[in-house]
Amino acid sequence: MSIHVKNNIHWVGQRDWEVRDFHGTEYKTHKGTSYNSYLIREGKNVLIDTVDHKFSREFVQNLAAEIDLATIDYVVINHAEEDHAGALTELMARIPGTPIYCTHNAIDSITGHHHHPEWNFHPVKTGDSLDIGNGKQLVFIETPMLHWPDSMMTYMTEDAVLFSNDAFGQHYCDEHLFNDEVDQTELMEQCQRYYANILTPFSPLVTAKIKEVLGFNLPVSMVATSHGIVWREDPTQIILKYLEWADHYQEDRITLFYDSMSNNTRMMADAIAQGIHEVDPGVAVKIYNVARHDKNEILTQVFRSKGILVGSSTMNNVMMPKVAGMLEEITGLRFRNKRASAFGSYGWTGGAVDRIQTRLMDAGFDISISLKAKWRPDGSALAECREHGRQLARQWALHPLDAPRPLATTQATPAPEMPAAVTAAPKATAAAAEWDDDQAMLCTVCQWVYDPAQGEPDQLVAPGTPWAQVPDSFLCPGCGIGKEVFEPCAVEACV
């Protein structure tokens, strides 16, 4: 079954109502998902992306009912991951010589998944275009690490449709295809969940890439994503949201999560939350047991929060395993502009709290004092927990607590405005800031470190070259992204 998108563009993807786990079991898809593939019929027939490999045969059968496969002139693969390009083997068996347009990195990924190096690959880079007839072109825009090195977007001129790949999407299945046809609250919840759990580590690149795309001054009438709905009504709303979420996002919200063997740490969490509420009744407070709640919901709440409290009983002098796993996830997501504190109960040693505090510091949180309670907290210990909550509420307040609360309490900063005309993403050069000659620089995407003492001989950057003198054409050896995603870092702190 196909769905008309616009003019000669049709959706030919696959809905997946049943899927509940994505990326292995790392992402819970309670609302299902869709694998969006698009068929363009102009002077040339173009297929943009396929579907997940488990639907390969069904996809090709449905596509053959829509169009004579032999008349497909080009296949465009925006992303090589199996939920996008999974049906390629089944499809290319039917049309083996058809050109496949993708990035250089995608050729490696596609070949690694499908083991067909003989396919007719045509690598593209940002600014390359493909004439599809009737005065229309496809323009390609590389988006490395959003969220794979091979990722790109495709823009269709005249129709002004941006096929955005994973960006601006959501794991959300609905019989309706367009954003104006579905529940808006549910939709935005899934968009934020998707960003928080998948794209947060790449926020600096999100901002740079959106500004680069806007700098082309191309009109956008629709954003056709790879998962979930197509943005037809006011498509710039999701672009604005991404700019907001990428800008050290926080709300006036505090999240507590914990694990407990005997409910002692749970009692502490409840008391701390009570203390926060006593001092700042307007702040949103949520409590989660990591052993019982949806991990991705907790991570989304962490993304939204100005501060978090992480609690654990001590077991074998370390934290509970599920708390440790959650902190590993949080470290990888690289949240910014957030405060944190550890708490927990113990019997004879209290190693869990100290280890949590260290992990939170390593993850980039602004650390506040921690709290321990021995054995089951009594009335005095619970009073101490409530006082701890009161102190944190005062320290973490986004507004004077003795003044009337602002009307808009959920946002720490106003949403950014869409630039009227934006130039290409700014380069992190000496013009923007002056660095010491020995200043190391950290790639915020892959964590590779540029050490001036070592330089980067593979790119003809000699040892002893300060960052300000590194050419603007420099690309991170770890992820292939430019200087705009680097930030200062002490060498000893980065290695």
From Swiss-Prot:
Annotated binding of FMN, by residue: 260-264, 342-369
Cofactor(s) listed: Fe cation; FMN
Biochemical pathway: Nitrogen metabolism; nitric oxide reduction
Domain Rubredoxin-like: 438-489
Subcellular localization(s) per the UniProt record: Cytoplasm
The protein's role, per its UniProt record: Anaerobic nitric oxide reductase; uses NADH to detoxify nitric oxide (NO), protecting several 4Fe-4S NO-sensitive enzymes. Has at least 2 reductase partners, only one of which (NorW, flavorubredoxin reductase) has been identified. NO probably binds to the di-iron center; electrons enter from the NorW at rubredoxin and are transferred sequentially to the FMN center and the di-iron center. Also able to function as an aerobic oxygen reductase.
Record-linked PANTHER family: ANAEROBIC NITRIC OXIDE REDUCTASE FLAVORUBREDOXIN (PTHR43717:SF1)
Subunit structure: Homotetramer.
Protein name: Anaerobic nitric oxide reductase flavorubredoxin
